[in-house]
Amino acid sequence: VTVYDAEGTKVQIDGSLRVEL
């Protein structure tokens, strides 16, 4: 799962929907 934080930084997360801001 690839998500983006509030600053548009690409954050790679395995098996989790948690976003590190």
Curated annotation (Swiss-Prot):
Any one GO CC term of the record: cell outer membrane
Principal subcellular localization: membrane
Functional note: Structural rigidity of the outer membrane of elementary bodies and porin forming, permitting diffusion of solutes through the intracellular reticulate body membrane.
GO biological process, one term: monoatomic ion transport
Topology term for the membrane: Multi-pass membrane protein
Name of protein: 40 kDa major outer membrane protein
Domain of life, per lineage: Bacteria
Subcellular locations according to the entry: Cell outer membrane
Quaternary structure, from the entry: Disulfide bond interactions within and between MOMP molecules and other components form high molecular-weight oligomers.
GO molecular function annotation: porin activity
Native species: Actinobacillus pleuropneumoniae (Haemophilus pleuropneumoniae)
Keywords (A to Z) from UniProt: Cell outer membrane, Disulfide bond, Ion transport, Membrane, Porin, Transmembrane, Transmembrane beta strand, Transport
